[in-house]
C-alpha cells in the first residue's frame, strides 16, 4: 500500500513532500522518493529503506529547490525493493515523471508494445510503463494525454504526474485506489490519505473513480475521463492525526477489516481474464500441472487455517491428495515428499522462521515449491521456485484479517487452475465459480455494513471464560480461524472442534450458559451440524450460528443467527470469517483490550 503526496504553492516543495510522506509511514513501505521542478528541470531523489535515508540525502529537502513536486513511499508489488524500482519514474527524456499506487494488470502487454517502439526500461515496475505511455501519447496537452492512457490501462491506480513543459501544474488521477486533494493558503496538495495534509488544511476533496484533478497555485480543476470539467465540494475533516491515520476508524484492526473488499479484489482481478484463471507467475506448464501427484501446504497460524480450507477445495475440484502441515512440525519430521510433489508455502511476511525453514527443507529434497506471500522481495519470495503474491498491503494490527482473506483467494484460484488444466471440473461449474468469486468483494462489504448487529451480540458475552467453535468440513477450517481470532485479541479461552467429534469427550465441557459458535455453510452438513447444536443446547449452551441465507432451520435451535449472502459453498470461508473477525474485535474492545487491535 504505497503513499503518494504532491504539492504546488508558494513554499519550497521538498520539505512539504517529506513531511507528508512521514505522515503516511504507518501504511508500510520499503523505499521512498521525491521529484521537484526547480524552474529548469525536474530533479529526483529516491532510495531504498526508511524515509530517513531520503531526508539525509536531501538535507530534509533543502538541496531540492522548487515549489512544485510529487513524492512516494513504495510497498513493492512489481519488482523487489531497490533504488531503481523506487518511485518516482521518468519517461526517456525526463520531461514527465510519475508516482503510482496500485497495480496495472495489463502492464506486460503495454510494456511489450512500448519496447517494440524502441522504449527502454530501467526498472521492473509496472509504474515505469505509465511514464512511457504518457510519453508515447503526449501531444502537448496533459489532460488529453492522461485520458488516452487511462483508456488503455487495466487495473487500479492513483497517480501523481508532473510535465516539465507545464511547470505550474500538478496532475492526479484516481481509479480504484484512494486519492485526496487538499487546498490551503500556501498551496494545493494531493495525498493517498488524510494525515499527509492535516498540517496544512482540513478541507479536502475526495476523488472518485476515473476522475482527474489539475492543481495550480491558484486553484483546482476536476475532470472525468471524458475531459468534462466537474464541480466538487470539499469535506471538512474533524479527525485528529491519530484518527486520520486509521482512516476515521477507531482501531487499525477495524480499518483493515474494512479494507478486505479491496484487498480481495486486488488479489483476484488480475488473475481472472476472459472468464479464465490466469496465474502467469505460477511458472508451470499444463503438462507439469497434470503431472503433480501430491500437494503439501505448509504454514503457521492463520495462514495454516487457509491451507486447511484449501485442502478441501483442491481435493474436491482437482482430485489431488493434499496434506496440510504446521511449518514448525513439518521442518522437524523428515516428511516423505514423493516425486512430482508440489509444496505450497504460505506466509504473510515471507519471513516466518519455521515456514522459511520448511521451504528450505522442501528444496533440499528436490521438489517444486510455490510461495504465497504478501511482501515482495521477502526471503520466501526469493527462495521459492515461484511466488504468487497476495495484494493485501501492510497489516498493522496484531491479528491478521486482510492477509488471511487474500491467502484464501490465492489458493481458490490455484485450485481452480489445477482443476481446469486436469479436466476435473466442467466448464459450466467453472464459469459459475468465476461468477461467485467476482461477487465476493461486494458481499464482504455487505457483511461489514452490518457490523453493529455483531457488536450488540458480542457485548452480551464479554465475561465469557470459555468459547467453543464447531463446524464440519470447510466449516471446521473456518471455526479454527474464528477461535484463533477470539483468543488472540480477547484473551478468552477458545477452542475449535470438528462438530462430529463433540461426542468424543468435548461434550463434557459444555455447561449451562457456555457459548458455542456453530458454522454451517456446507449444505451437505446442515442436518448433522444442527443435530450437534441440539446436543449442546440440551446441556444449556447458548449458540451463535453463522450460516448461509435460506438455511432457516437453524433458527429453531440457535439463539442468534448471522446470515451470509449466497455463494458457492467452497468459497464460503471468505464470507463466514467476516462476522467471526468482527465478533473477536468487539469482544476485545468491550473488555478494554484496545492495545491488541490498535
Task: Name each model feature, range by range.
Residues 180-202, 328-362, 503-535, 567-581, ...:
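Glycine-rich, anion-gripping cofactor-binding loops and their flanking helix/strand elements
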Residues 227, 542, 555-557, 567-598:
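Generic C-terminus detector
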Residues 290-432, 436-439, 519-562, 583:
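Glycine-rich phosphate-binding loops that contact phosphosugars or nucleotide phosphates
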Amino acid at each position: 500500500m504505497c503513499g503518494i503526496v504532491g504539492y504546488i504553492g508558494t513554499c519550497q516543495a521538498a520539505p512539504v513532500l517529506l513531511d507528508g510522506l512521514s505522515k503516511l509511514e504507518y501504511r508500510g513501505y520499503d523505499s521512498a522518493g521525491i521529484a521537484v521542478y526547480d524552474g529548469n528541470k525536474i530533479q529526483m531523489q529516491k532510495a531504498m529503506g526508511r524515509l530517513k535515508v531520503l531526508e539525509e540525502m536531501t538535507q530534509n529537502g533543502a538541496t531540492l529547490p522548487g515549489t512544485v513536486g510529487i513524492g512516494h513511499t513504495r510497498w513493492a508489488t512489481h519488482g523487489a525493493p531497490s533504488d531503481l524500482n523506487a518511485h518516482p519514474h521518468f519517461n526517456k527524456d525526463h520531461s514527465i515523471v510519475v508516482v503510482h499506487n496500485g497495480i496495472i494488470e495489463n502492464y506486460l502487454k503495454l510494456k511489450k508494445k512500448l519496447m517494440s517502439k524502441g522504449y527502454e526500461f530501467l526498472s521492473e515496475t509496472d509504474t515505469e510503463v505509465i511514464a512511457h505511455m504518457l510519453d508515447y501519447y503526449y501531444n502537448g496537452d496533459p489532460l488529453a494525454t492522461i485520458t488516452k492512457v487511462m483508456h488503455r490501462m487495466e487495473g487500479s491506480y492513483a497517480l501523481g504526474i508532473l510535465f516539465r513543459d507545464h511547470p505550474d501544474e500538478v496532475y492526479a488521477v484516481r481509479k480504484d485506489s484512494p486519492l485526496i486533494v487538499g487546498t490551503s493558503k500556501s498551496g494545493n496538495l494531493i495525498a493517498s490519505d488524510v494525515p499527509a495534509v492535516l498540517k496544512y488544511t482540513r478541507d479536502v476533496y475526495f476523488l472518485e473513480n476515473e476522475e482527474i484533478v489539475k492543481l495550480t497555485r491558484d486553484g483546482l480543476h476536476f475532470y472525468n475521463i471524458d475531459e468534462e470539467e466537474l464541480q466538487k465540494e470539499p469535506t471538512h475533516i474533524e479527525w485528529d492525526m491519530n484518527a486520520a491515520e486509521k482512516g476515521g476508524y477507531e482501531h487499525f484492526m477495524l480499518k483493515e477489516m474494512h479494507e478486505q473488499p479491496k484487498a480481495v479484489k486486488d488479489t483476484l482481478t488480475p488473475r481472472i481474464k476472459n472468464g479464465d484463471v490466469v496465474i502467469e507467475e505460477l511458472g508451470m506448464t499444463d503438462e507439469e500441472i497434470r503431472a503433480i501427484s501430491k500437494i503439501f501446504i505448509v504454514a503457521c497460524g492463520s495462514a495454516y487455517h487457509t491451507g486447511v480450507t484449501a485442502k478441501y477445495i483442491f481435493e474436491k475440484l482437482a482430485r489431488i491428495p493434499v496434506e496440510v502441515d504446521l511449518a514448525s512440525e513439518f521442518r522437524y519430521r523428515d516428511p516423505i515428499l514423493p516425486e512430482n510433489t508440489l509444496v505450497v508455502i504460505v506466509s504473510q511476511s515471507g519471513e516466518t522462521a519455521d515456514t522459511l525453514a520448511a521451504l528450505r527443507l522442501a528444496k533440499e529434497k528436490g521438489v517444486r515449491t510455490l510461495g504465497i506471500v504478501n511482501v515482495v522481495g521477502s526471503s520466501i519470495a526469493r527462495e521459492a521456485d515461484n511466488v504468487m503474491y497476495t495484494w493485501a498491503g501492510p497489516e498493522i494490527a496484531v491479528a491478521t484479517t486482510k492477509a488471511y482473506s487474500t491467502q484464501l483467494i490465492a489458493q481458490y484460484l490455484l485450485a481452480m487452475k489445477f482443476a481446469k488444466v486436469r479436466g476435473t471440473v466442467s466448464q459450466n461449474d467453472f464459469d459459475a465459480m468465476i461468477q461467485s468469486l467476482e461477487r465476493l468483494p461486494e458481499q464482504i462489504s455487505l457483511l461489514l455494513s452490518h457490523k453493529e448487529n455483531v457488536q450488540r451480540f458480542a457485548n452480551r458475552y464479554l465475561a465469557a471464560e470459555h468459547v467453543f467453535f464447531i463446524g464440519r468440513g470447510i466449516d471446521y477450517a473456518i471455526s479454527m480461524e474464528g477461535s484463533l481470532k477470539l483468543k488472540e485479541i480477547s484473551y478468552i479461552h477458545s477452542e475449535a472442534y470438528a462438530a462430529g467429534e463433540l461426542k468424543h469427550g468435548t461434550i463434557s465441557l459444555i455447561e449451562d450458559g457456555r457459548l458455542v459458535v456453530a458454522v454451517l455453510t456446507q449444505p451437505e452438513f446442515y442436518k448433522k451440524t444442527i443435530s450437534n447444536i441440539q446436543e449442546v443446547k440440551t446441556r444449556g449452551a447458548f449458540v451463535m450460528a453463522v450460516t448461509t441465507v435460506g438455511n432457516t432451520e437453524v433458527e429453531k435451535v440457535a439463539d442468534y443467527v448471522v446470515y451470509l449472502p449466497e455463494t458457492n459453498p467452497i468459497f464460503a470461508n471468505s464470507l463466514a470469517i467476516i462476522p467471526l473477525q468482527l465478533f473477536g474485535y468487539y469482544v476485545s474492545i468491550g473488555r478494554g483490550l484496545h492495545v491488541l487491535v490498535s
